[in-house]
Design a protein with these regions (language model features):
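Beta-propeller fold detector
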Residues: 31-40, 75-83, 120-134, 181-189, ...
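Short, conserved, GDST-rich strand-edge loop motifs in beta-rich repeat architectures
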Residues: 154-168, 212-227, 274-292
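Short glycine/acidic-enriched loop and turn motifs that connect beta-strands
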Residues: 15-18, 61-63, 106-109, 159-163, ...
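Beta-propeller blade signature
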Residues: 112-115, 166-179, 224-236, 290-303, ...
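Post-signal peptide N-terminal segment of secreted/secretory-pathway proteins
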Residues: 19-112
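Loop/turn-rich, solvent-exposed surfaces of beta-rich toroidal or solenoidal domains
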Residues: 258-333
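Short, small-residue-biased leader/transition segments that mark boundaries at the very start
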Residues: 2-7
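Repeated scaffold domains used in trafficking and secretory/extracellular systems
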Residues: 39-51, 84-93, 135-144, 192-201, ...
Length: 369
C-alpha cells in the first residue's frame, strides 16, 4: 500500500511561541506543512477524533471546539463549549454520539457532555476520592480514561502539589449507564496513573485486557515508581501478577543506559507499543525542557516486558507527537535531523527519516480514518 493512496487525512497541531496551530494535511506524501490555513489556539490544546469530527480541547483557556472536515478545511460545528476558568480540561472520552466525559484536572470533576450538540448534560464530583481530603485537598486530579464493558476507568494523579503525587496508583471505576462511581482501586507498586493528558493510555489490547501506565511523578521523586499495570478482562482490580517498569532496565545505546519514564505512546497490536522515553543522560543541569533532546523513541512489548531503542535521534519534550496510520507509526519530532514527521513501517521494520517538514514544532497528531 502506497503512502498516498490510503492515508488521506491527518489532523495535527504545531506550536510556535505560545500558540498551537491546528490544520489538516492530505497524506504522508506531502513534503511540507504550513500554518497558513491553521486555526490558532493556546499552546496546550489537545486533539480528539470521533465519528468523523475533530474536537480541540483548549486546556489553559478551558474551551472545547468541534469541527468537521470540508474541502480540506476545518469548519466549526455548534457553539464553543466554555468550561469554568481554571478547570484545566485535559482529556475527552467518548461513550457514544450522545455522551462523552471530560476530565477536568483543575476541578476534580468529570463533565458529562453530548458531543453531538456540544451541551453539558451532567457532572461527577470526585472530591470524596481525593487522598488528601482530610487535610483539605478535595481534588484527586482526574486524567486520561477509557471505557471497557460499560465501565469508565479514570486515572487519578492524586497530587499533593503540581507534579508531586501521593505514592501509589489510583483508578476510579464509574458505571457509564448511571454515571455513579463503583469504586476506587489502588496499587502501591507504581505511582500516578496516567500523565494528566492523553499519552496513549489507558489502552485495551485484543484480549480485552486493560493496561495503564503510571508515570511516577515524571522522574522527580525516588519514591514514586513508574510502570505498566494491568486489569484483566472480566476483572475490576489490578492484576497482582503483572507489573512492568522500564526505569530498572539497563538499556544499551543511550547515555547512562537508563530511562526514567515513558511520555506519549501508541498501541499498535500484539502487545507492542511505540513511545518516547525520557533519558536523564540527555537532560542538562538545570533542565531545559524547550531544548533538551532527552525524549528517545522506543518499541515496547508489554507481553514480554522488553524495550528496544529505535533508530531515530532524540527530540524535545514539546515535540514528541505520534499516531498510527495504517502500518506506519508517524513521529513528530524536533531532532538533530530536522523538525517534522518521521515514519516507521512497523510491519516491515522500515524507517523514513524526516519524511515531512513542518512549520512549527509538532505537538499533537491524529489520523482520520
Amino acid at each position: 500500500r502506497g503512502l498516498g493512496d490510503v492515508y488521506k487525512r491527518q489532523v495535527h497541531s504545531v506550536t510556535v511561541g505560545d500558540n498551537a496551530y491546528v490544520s489538516l494535511f492530505k497524506d504522508l506524501n506531502v513534503e511540507q506543512t504550513s500554518t497558513q490555513n491553521s486555526l490558532v489556539f493556546a499552546k496546550e490544546s489537545f486533539l480528539f477524533t470521533y465519528g468523523g469530527n475533530i474536537y480541540v480541547l483548549e486546556s489553559m483557556n478551558a474551551r472545547l471546539y468541534k469541527y468537521r472536515v470540508e474541502n480540506g478545511l476545518l469548519i466549526q460545528e455548534k457553539e464553543t463549549m466554555i468550561l469554568p476558568s481554571g478547570s484545566l480540561p485535559a482529556f475527552l472520552t467518548f461513550d457514544s454520539e450522545e455522551k462523552a466525559y471530560i476530565s477536568c484536572v483543575g476541578l476534580g470533576k468529570l463533565y458529562i457532555i453530548n458531543p453531538t450538540t456540544m451541551q453539558k448534560t451532567g457532572e461527577i464530583d470526585l472530591s470524596e476520592y481525593a487522598i488528601g481530603k482530610e487535610s483539605g485537598d478535595k481534588n484527586p486530579e482526574p486524567g486520561a480514561s477509557v471505557i471497557r464493558d460499560g465501565i469508565l476507568y479514570v486515572g487519578l494523579a492524586q497530587d499533593k502539589s503540581q507534579f508531586n503525587p501521593n505514592t501509589g496508583a489510583y483508578v476510579l471505576l464509574i458505571d457509564t449507564k448511571t454515571d455513579k462511581p463503583i469504586k476506587m482501586i489502588s496499587d502501591n507498586r507504581a505511582t500516578m496513573a496516567t500523565a494528566y493528558e492523553y499519552s496513549g493510555d489507558p489502552f485495551i489490547d485484543e484480549k480485552g485486557d486493560l493496561y495503564i501506565y503510571c508515570v511516577g511523578g515524571f522522574g522527580y521523586f525516588a519514591n514514586c515508581t513508574e510502570g505498566f499495570l494491568r486489569i484483566k478482562k472480566g476483572e475490576t482490580d489490578f492484576d497482582q501478577s503483572y507489573y512492568f517498569p522500564i526505569e530498572t532496565i539497563s538499556i544499551p545505546d543511550i547515555k547512562g543506559n537508563k530511562a526514567n519514564y515513558i511520555y506519549s505512546k501508541t498501541y499498535t497490536g500484539n502487545g507492542k507499543l511505540y513511545g518516547y522515553f525520557n533519558v536523564p543522560g540527555y537532560v542538562s543541569n538545570p533542565p531545559d525542557y524547550v531544548n533538551d533532546k532527552s525524549m528517545q523513541t522506543f518499541e515496547i512489548d508489554v507481553y514480554n516486558k522488553t524495550v528496544k531503542k529505535m533508530n531515530f535521534d532524540g527530540t524535545t519534550g514539546w515535540s514528541c507527537s505520534q499516531c498510527k496510520a495504517g502500518d506506519y507509526m508517524v513521529f513528530g519530532m524536533a531532532s538533530t535531523q530536522g523538525t517534522g514527521y518521521y515514519l516507521y513501517n512497523y510491519k516491515e521494520d522500515k524507517y523514513e527519516p524526516l519524511k515531512i517538514k513542518t512549520e512549527g514544532n509538532p505537538f499533537k497528531i491524529q489520523y482520520l480514518k
